[in-house]
Amino acid sequence: MSDKKAVILLSGGLDSATVVAMARAEGYACYSMSFDYGQRHRAELQAAERVARQLGVVEHKVVGLNLNGIGGSALTDSSIAVPETPGEGIPVTYVPARNTVFLSLALGWAEVLGARDIFIGVNAVDYSGYPDCRPEFVEAFERMANLATKAGVEGQGFAIRAPLQQMSKGEIIQAGMRLGVDYALTVSCYQADDDGRACGKCDSCRLRAAGFAAAGVPDATRYF
């Protein structure tokens, strides 16, 4: 096993699966972290486990959080409908501070493991407009990580890696195919059923379908 370790945020979706494959291709021993945070699309947790097995991660950790106790998002509050048509501004599927919370916990695990690199599959090209997916956020979090940790102040700095940041969804899928990602294992839908079948209507489904079309690859998604 490689001495070079990385912690990777793995939702079970298309983007994060590709990031695991990219990190593995760079020679990292991969440690993946998923979150059971009260999301309505819980099928993504089973997808994350499947992806972790397929791509040979060293350890896959699922952390429980109660973000539905805070609410404020269609993904954590069942009284808020998931939009089926694009809207203006930041959509109601934005989960307040989600990537800040997730990266903070990944940072803690990375410090324990002695990993210096943390990978996240955020994208600022084909995305829903979430503020915590932008390059400015990633750069700011990296600065904070190196101010707020024992490892950081002792000169063992962390890097927050976002390799998909400037890639289109089609480019991401093409890269993942070259690296052996089985996209049939992944779940992207915001309201997937218990079997992981997708609605085909939400923003995440639309972006995913457009990505497969742009990549010229058969869509591996199962729909209900």
From Swiss-Prot:
It catalyses: 7-carboxy-7-deazaguanine + NH4(+) + ATP = 7-cyano-7-deazaguanine + ADP + phosphate + H2O + H(+). Keywords: ATP-binding, Ligase, Metal-binding, Nucleotide-binding, Queuosine biosynthesis, Zinc. Binds 1 zinc ion per subunit. ATP binds at L10, S11, G12, G13, L14, D15, S16, A17, T18, V19, V20. One of its GO terms (biological process) is queuosine biosynthetic process. InterPro entries: QueC, Rossmann-like_a/b/a_fold. It comes from the Bacteria. It is an enzyme of class 6 (ligase). Pfam families: QueC (PF06508). Zn(2+) binds at C189, C199, C202, C205. Its cofactor is Zn(2+). Catalyzes the ATP-dependent conversion of 7-carboxy-7-deazaguanine (CDG) to 7-cyano-7-deazaguanine (preQ(0)). Belongs to the QueC family. This is 7-cyano-7-deazaguanine synthase.
